[in-house]
Amino acid sequence: MVSLVVEHRWKEKNAQDAFKVVGSIIDMQKNGKLPSGFTLKSVNVVENERMAVCEWDAPSVDDFKGLLEKVNPPTKHEVYLSKRLL
């Protein structure tokens, strides 16, 4: 299991679609529908920067990147391995 921080950035024209994806992923987490081993820990949106920072637990970085490929959010995203201190 790894802890990840994922930074998403979108263009203004993609904002509505980006928020649809965020909403559906949050609903999947709330309803226990994410694939086994994946947990969305937090979502922080900085709207005036068209950015979201999400914290995840996942089986591996590669598994998470595979999930991102399937979801295909309308964002540019960076995935960072992180160490949770608090």
Each predicted region: which residue ranges?
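Conserved short beta-strand edge segments in small beta-sheet-based binding/regulatory domains
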Residues: 73-86
